[in-house]
């Protein structure tokens, strides 16, 4: 039986640099292939070649789809063939309805007039196919990210998709939303729709894939049956070396208490009747990594936003640093108290995409380079930028390159470099490795470990329970704004954390000092 897709000996160059070097990929109808590799490995370039974003003639090699050679000059050419790609940054128009998004550019008309009745009927069938129980008239901006992802799939199905490409589809989804999405993909597989799945979450890759294709430095390293590969096998192929331990296995010597929060309560910015954080108290020691776990809506991010002075609503409670009560109502006051934060959404809150890498690093510490006068000491700033880039191993062709052009992992390292310029005593990391590859994760985990060895106290909020458990000395478990458990991490399991989150009564254990 012929393959649905064959990409033969694809090479794509930018100037003298080969982004893709003689890569081949093939899959059958109804097959799920995961494409794995570090950021910058060439995955996105290969998919842009396949989809016609890089047109025929701009690359070497051959693409055969459904028995015919594709020579696409535009993404619409491949869409007509039945190839659809859903990017991590969803391409929906938030102000339009679900129906309007699904039929955007593919409206059903009769005599030049749109047939809304027929489109509504078709839309309802598409939504049912992706298990979405919503009205076609719902505004997309009112949907959660998981629902928006399913609308994107419904939009692809409306184009008679035969090959669906999903690029980091679960990066911003909850575990429940992820489970729903994977079930939808399996259902599509039963209907003969093939899928190329791109994700840094190797547990998902293992769960969903028939085969796994690994690319490193623009070259095809290997394609194997998923059933015969472990996560360690995938990592070794991706990074070219064996990572014996993803999380640093070094004991932390904790010091005195540096932070204590008492009876923190925060209200919804608009609806004062809703408590997003409800009477939460906890402490933090020097040289300790404190993980905060919980489902989406648990109040984790809201808690640390209050601590950093950026929660947009009202809140009350007491914050003590070194035993002294402090008042923190904005980020400047937090920084003055020795607190720095890497935000949850780095693209929205962490970087200025069009600004240079170096300027992003020094953005919060420009007073270091003024010497009490208004004029900036450019030489001192450049020296500091180069040292930070070297220390954090930020991969960039130049400090003057716009940071938006870097991979997610290198953007995150630049934000960490900015935080370290503030000489923090308390470092808050909200989703520190979201959307970055395994190699960059490993480097960030090593850096976190080095910081706590220096006595810096670290708070880690993560939706990935293995990350929380792999890093933390102690884990706070939150649910619906309340602190449900305070657990010493002596071989804690994911099941124990989830049980603590979902049990009805409080279960706050005493800390061992």
Curated annotation (Swiss-Prot):
GO terms for molecular function: ABC-type D-xylose transporter activity; ATP binding; ATP hydrolysis activity. Its EC number is 7.5.2.10. It is found in: Cell inner membrane. PROSITE patterns: ABC_TRANSPORTER_1, ABC_TRANSPORTER_2, XYLG. It is a peripheral membrane protein. Residues 5-242, 259-505 form the ABC transporter domain. Transmembrane segments: none annotated. It catalyses: D-xylose(out) + ATP + H2O = D-xylose(in) + ADP + phosphate + H(+). The keyword Cell inner membrane applies. ATP binds at residues 37-44. It comes from the Bacteria. Keywords: ATP-binding, Cell inner membrane, Cell membrane, Membrane, Nucleotide-binding, Repeat, Sugar transport, Translocase, Transport. CDD domains: ABC_Carb_Monos_I (cd03216), ABC_Carb_Monos_II (cd03215). Its main location: membrane. One of its GO terms (cellular component) is plasma membrane. Part of the ABC transporter complex XylFGH involved in xylose import. Responsible for energy coupling to the transport system. Belongs to the ABC transporter superfamily. Xylose importer (TC 3.A.1.2.4) family. The complex is composed of two ATP-binding proteins (XylG), two transmembrane proteins (XylH) and a solute-binding protein (XylF). PANTHER family: CARBOHYDRATE TRANSPORT ATP-BINDING PROTEIN MG119-RELATED, XYLOSE IMPORT ATP-BINDING PROTEIN XYLG. This is Xylose import ATP-binding protein XylG.
């Amino acid at each position: 039986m012929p393959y649905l897709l064959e990409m033969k000996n694809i090479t794509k160059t930018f100037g003298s640099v080969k982004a893709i070097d003689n890569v081949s990929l093939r899959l059958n109808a109804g097959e799920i292939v995961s494409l794995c590799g570090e950021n910058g490995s060439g995955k996105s370039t290969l998919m842009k070649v396949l989809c016609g974003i890089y047109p025929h003639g701009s690359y070497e090699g051959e693409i055969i789809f459904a028995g015919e050679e594709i020579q696409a000059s535009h993404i619409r050419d491949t869409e007509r063939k039945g190839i659809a790609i859903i990017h991590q940054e969803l391409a929906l128009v938030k102000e339009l309805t679900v129906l309007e998004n699904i039929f955007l550019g593919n409206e059903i008309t009769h005599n030049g007039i749109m047939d809304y009745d027929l489109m509504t009927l078709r839309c309802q069938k598409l939504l049912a196919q992706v298990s979405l129980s919503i009205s076609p008239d719902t505004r997309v901006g009112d949907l959660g990210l998981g629902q928006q992802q399913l609308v994107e799939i419904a939009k692809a199905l409306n184009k008679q998709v035969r090959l669906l490409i999903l690029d980091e589809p679960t990066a911003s989804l909850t575990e429940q939303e992820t489970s729903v999405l994977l079930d939808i993909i399996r259902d599509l597989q039963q209907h003969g729709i093939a899928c190329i799945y791109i994700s840094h979450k190797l547990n998902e890759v293992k769960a969903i894939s028939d085969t796994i294709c690994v690319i490193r430095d623009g070259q095809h390293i290997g394609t194997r049956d998923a059933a015969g590969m472990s996560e360690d096998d995938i990592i070794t192929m991706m990074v070219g070396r064996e990572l014996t331990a993803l999380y640093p296995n070094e004991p932390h010597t904790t010091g005195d208490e540096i932070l204590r929060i008492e009876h923190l309560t925060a209200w919804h910015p608009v609806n004062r009747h809703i408590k997003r954080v409800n009477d939460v108290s906890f402490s933090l020691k020097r040289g300790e990594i404190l993980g905060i776990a919980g489902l989406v809506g648990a109040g984790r991010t809201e808690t640390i936003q209050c601590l950093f002075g950026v929660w947009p609503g009202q809140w009350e409670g007491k914050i003590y640093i070194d035993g002294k009560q402090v008042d923190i109502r904005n980020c400047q006051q937090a920084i003055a108290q020795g607190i720095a934060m890497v935000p949850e959404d780095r693209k929205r809150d962490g970087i200025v995409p069009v600004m240079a890498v170096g300027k992003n690093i020094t953005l919060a510490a420009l007073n270091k380079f003024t010497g009490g006068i208004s004029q900036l000491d450019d030489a001192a700033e450049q020296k500091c930028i180069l040292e930070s880039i070297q220390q954090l191993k930020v991969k960039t062709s130049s400090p003057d390159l716009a940071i938006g052009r870097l991979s997610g992992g290198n953007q995150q390292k630049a934000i960490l470099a900015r935080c370290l310029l503030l000489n923090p005593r308390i470092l808050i990391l909200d989703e520190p490795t979201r959307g970055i590859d395994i190699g960059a994760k490993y480097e960030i985990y090593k850096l976190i470990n080095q910081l706590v060895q220096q006595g810096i106290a670290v708070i880690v909020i993560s939706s990935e329970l293995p990350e929380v458990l792999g890093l933390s000395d102690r884990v706070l478990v939150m649910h619906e704004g309340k602190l449900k458990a305070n657990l010493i991490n002596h071989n804690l399991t994911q099941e124990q954390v989830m049980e603590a989150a979902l049990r009805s009564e409080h279960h706050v254990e005493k800390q061992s000092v």
